[in-house]
Amino acid sequence: MIPSQFYGFLHLQHREFSAVNVSVGSFRQKIRTYLRNADILSRSLEAHGHAFHLLTNNSNLIQRFSPRISERLSISEIEFSTPVPTGVRFFSSHYKLDALRYLGNEQNDYAALIDLDMLCINTAPEALLEAERSGQALYYDITDQVVPSAGEEPLRAQLEEILGRPVDLQWSGGEFLAGPPAYFRALAEAVEQIYQRYIDVSVGRYRVGNEPYQNAAIEILRHNGWNIADAGPMGVVARYWNMPVKHNQPPFRAFRDKFLVHLPVDKHVLNLMRTLSPSRPESFLTLYAATKWLWLPLEVLNRLWGKLGSVRIRR
């Protein structure tokens, strides 16, 4: 038994350039970057026997800008109704609440909601299979990664202001949640309780995006008796920064046995991998290891491309 349903979401809105950890020069380039990431993620999951579905607010725009990817991906257009302040950083990531609502109302026995800049590089570990069998709710704890860069006290203060009570700081990454529909439904309901408070407290003062309100919601669920396990030690998911970082990150060889790896700064590397059309299960890990060193040249090239608006890469 494997979690047969993996979901990602892509909210599109012109003039709200919500690209994260990547240089893009236009709305069109943003769409194509994230769609190519979704495509290589989908291929890697399919190579290991999993299905991937992309949730979006504008399937017509996806079809217009990337018709081939639109045909290949399983895409569902859903309602995105979360009120998001215009101009806020990470604008589109706020709509994760709508993806939580959607999965809370689905009939899947078990599903995972993941970021698009990820790869499936191994067979699902037994711990994930057991989590599905038992209906275990999962998240990914990145406290040891985020505290060195953001500081423990600002993170704790933000959550305590949102929730109105003291908390034991455990910070989850936005790239991975898995569980039965009841878990996603409970998360959505918890976010709805504190969302406006999150906006009032955070905009202009603290971190913004889906991570802060997701963490507040998980804290509410724990307070209400939910048992939510960390998928990181299970080997289910890991975040690898392909650049110097403030936390103690091991070399990439320590990530080779993970099921899913999140690659926040490697969006252009993932796009390059897609052009090479890997298909065998083992080829995704091999190809990433061979091309990961290109992240900086690709980032610089795409930044120049975005500024000039006329640069074209010729094969």
Where are each of the predicted segments found?
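Short beta-strand-to-loop acidic/aromatic patch adjacent to the donor-nucleotide binding site
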Residues: 100, 108-119
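Catalytic core and acceptor-binding pocket of nucleotide-sugar-dependent glycosyltransferases
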Residues: 166-260
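Long, low-complexity C-terminal extensions of enzymes
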Residues: 244-315
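Conserved donor-nucleotide/metal-binding helix-loop-beta segment in metal-dependent transferases, i.e.
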Residues: 120-157
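N-terminal anchoring/stem segment of glycosyltransferases
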Residues: 1-84, 107, 289-315
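Hydrophobic anchor at the start of a short beta-strand
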Residues: 51-53, 111, 225-228
